[in-house]
Amino acid sequence: MVRSVWKGPFVEGSLLKKADAARASGRHDVIKIWSRRSTILPQFVGLVFGVYNGQKHVPVSVNEEMVGHKFGEFSPTRTFHGHSGDKKAKRS
């Protein structure tokens, strides 16, 4: 389900403060965030966020194509190690 238009995009308040401070200072450090549910806004383009995936902060460099998506989409939480092989002995 899509969020209703009249509500606007959800962004954590602390995330906005961190992004504004990074823009004002002009430094390009990784901004650590835990809010995977926050929407990426146009003012975040060009910044690098460290999105927490449960183990570590995955660096996500925001570009124009990411606007409107959620931060969690770019920081996978599960690792796929492949399906197990055939346990039966193969006959030739």
From Swiss-Prot:
Transmembrane segments: none
Keyword Ribonucleoprotein recorded: yes
Protein name, per record: Small ribosomal subunit protein uS19
Assigned protein family: Belongs to the universal ribosomal protein uS19 family.
Function according to Swiss-Prot or TrEMBL: Protein S19 forms a complex with S13 that binds strongly to the 16S ribosomal RNA.
MF GO annotations: rRNA binding; structural constituent of ribosome
Pfam families membership: Ribosomal_S19
NCBIfam families linked to this entry: rpsS_bact
